[in-house]
Amino acid sequence: MNRKYHKTRGNIARTCAITGSKLHLVHPLGFKIDEKSLKRAGLDYWDKLEIEEHNSLEDFLKKYPPEENNMFFATTKGKTKYTDIDYSKMDEVFILYGKETKGLPEWLLKKYLDKKTIRIPMLPLLRSLNLSNSVCVITYEILRQKNFENMQEISQYFDN
């Protein structure tokens, strides 16, 4: 991602922090995770975020082999709707997203197209949803299927 996407990165970081989801960052990033604009985009959630960095996509896939993990690849080319997966009994779920401009690498999609690709249904008017919106939609579907386990049910900011 280049610098014009710092708000997208901040939104993704905030979604991960507020849902207790680990954020895996795969290098090369195209940005520094300590730059002021990234922290500003992540608001006050950046220090509450669990981050794991990987030197490359290959290193990530070696550490977390898709065949041995509950791993899905989010893409507009996906064979399965993200809501058709039963996440409810999965302890750990990995959802990989590609670059905002290009998506996931073609070789990866070809390898896992029939088994592990998921998509968000949308009208064919535009290329895709904003990346941070996609992350939020799929993350909350996983949480919904798990009955929002460990999530706060009622706001703590008002007396009920």
Regions found by a protein language model. Give the residues of each.
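Post-transcriptional modification and biogenesis factors for structured RNAs
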Residues: 1-160
